[in-house]
Swiss-Prot record:
The UniProt record lists the keyword Amino-acid biosynthesis: no
GO molecular function, one term: zinc ion binding
Protein name: KIN17-like protein
Compositionally biased intervals (Low complexity): 215-229, 239-253
UniProt source species: Dictyostelium discoideum
Zinc finger (C2H2-type): 26-50
GO biological process, one term: DNA damage response
């Protein structure tokens, strides 16, 4: 058959296949294989490799589903922590970013049947802040990085210390203003004074003069009365002038005319002085106590800061020791051997073209570099062992041990422990059965 014309079903199907836009129902999660059409998917379902994977799944269905769920959750949270770390975003937007990877774990393979259930799960486990709105579910990532948490705690403590210092300064300024206003009011107050003996004598003299003038007016003639009245007024004027002069002298020079205090006044004056001294003493003691409290608070703050610094230094030292120990323990050792089947795990190699593809090692170039020939396409690649992983065949198959004392020996798989990620191997040459982890043996080509 020739090529289909433009806009025909065949041409449209070819374009879709060329773009890599295949349907989800034609994708096999167990085998991680995407089929192009329904016929190819049926052929894959009836294949031997798929049936073998289905047998493994039937034995450990819950374990495999939990593994897929764990990988799905980790990848989803990794996108949240890198692209949306401090923002509130729709859950659909994050999921759209997640499915851009062609080799992502599909949600149908997990324990969650929908994105809503997965979002609710994140909210219940306190891994994200979840909010349901008319526009859909919104989520915010909760950053639990130790360095980020410590930085936030230190910033909050610093803000509290600054607020306490500002509040203390404000209260001290208000107290000083109140004391100044109180002293000013006391100075402005005009207190009443008692009448002195001299004032009483002056008042009696005025009364006598007035009485004498009234007597003279009754006995004398009209003319004499006028003259006497004039004299009386003159006397009153002179008395007024004298009293005004005396008042002026009292105001300008109060000390020469100061009155001696009586015994009762002296006692009251002494009591007031004692009260004033006691108040001053109490205020002085309060100020000293406040200063001591401030000094103690400052010392406590300094001690707390020193303790925090010491704790941070200890944590940094422990982290450095852990890193050093991990580096010492994780020193990479060569494990690649000729004629073993391996799987490529490098997502960036040829833009993910060879990701999860199997091949066998044709030759070992050096301790860490191998020449690999792919089983499906026949392509030959040179690739480092860090981008390869071992392949675990079914029970009864022959494998080659790649690590440890029996490196290079052939063995037969007797049993596989999926929970502990290891298997029991029978070495015919030594006639022994040993248990090794998955990464210590691989399928023989």
């Amino acid at each position: 058959m020739g090529k289909g014309d433009a806009l025909t079903p065949k041409q449209i199907a070819n374009k879709i296949k060329a773009k890599g836009l295949q349907r989800l129902r034609w994708y096999c999660q167990l085998c991680e294989k995407q089929c192009r059409d329904e016929n190819g998917f049926k052929c894959h379902i009836s294949s031997e490799s798929h049936m073998r994977q289905m047998e493994v799944f039937s034995n450990k269905s819950s374990f495999i589903v939990s593994q897929y769920s764990k990988e799905f959750e980790e990848d989803f949270l990794r996108i949240m922590s890198r692209q949306f770390i401090n923002s509130r975003v729709p859950a659909n937007q994050v999921y759209a970013e997640y499915i851009k990877d062609r080799h992502h774990i599909h949600m149908n393979a997990t324990e969650w049947t929908s994105l809503t259930e997965f979002v609710k799960y994140l909210g219940k486990t306190s891994k994200c802040e979840v909010e349901e709105t008319p526009k859909g579910w919104f989520i915010r990532y909760i950053n639990r990085d130790p360095e980020y948490v410590m930085r936030k705690v230190s910033e909050e403590k610093k803000e509290k210390a600054e607020l306490n210092e500002e509040e203390r300064q404000r209260l001290q300024i208000e107290k000083q203003i109140k004391e100044l206003n109180k002293n000013k009011i006391e100075q402005d107050e005009i207190k009443p004074t008692e009448l002195s003996k001299e004032d009483l004598e002056k008042m009696s003299l005025l009364e006598l003069n007035i009485k004498s003038t009234t007597n003279t007016t009754t006995t004398t003639t009209n003319t004499t009365t006028t003259t006497t009245n004039k004299n009386i007024f003159d006397k009153l004027k002179t008395n007024d002038n004298n009293s005004s002069n005396n008042n002026y002298n009292d105001q300008t020079n109060p000390k020469p005319y100061a009155k001696k205090m009586s015994a009762i006044e002296e006692i009251m004056f002494k009591e007031k002085e004692k009260e004033r001294q006691q108040k001053e003493k109490l205020e002085f003691e309060k100020q000293q106590q406040q200063q001591q409290q401030q000094q103690q608070q400052q010392q406590q703050q300094q001690q707390q800061q020193q303790q925090q610094q010491q704790q941070q230094q200890q944590q940094q030292q422990q982290q450095q020791q852990q890193l050093n120990s991990n580096n010492n323990n994780n020193e990479e050792k060569p494990w690649i051997i000729k004629d073993i089947v391996i799987k490529i795990i490098d997502k960036e190699l040829a833009n993910g073209k060879y990701f999860k593809q199997k091949g066998y090692i044709v030759s070992v170039e050096n301790e860490f570099l191998a020449k690999v020939k792919l089983l499906d396409s026949g392509d030959i690649l040179k690739i480092d062992q860090t981008f390869l992983e071992t392949v675990i065949p079914q029970i009864g198959s022959t494998v080659i041990i790649v690590n440890g004392k029996y490196r290079g020996k052939e063995a037969t798989i007797k049993n596989v422990n999926f929970d502990d990620f290891n298997a029991k191997l029978y070495i015919k040459d030594n006639d022994i059965t040993i248990t090794l982890p998955y990464e210590s043996f691989s399928k023989q080509y």
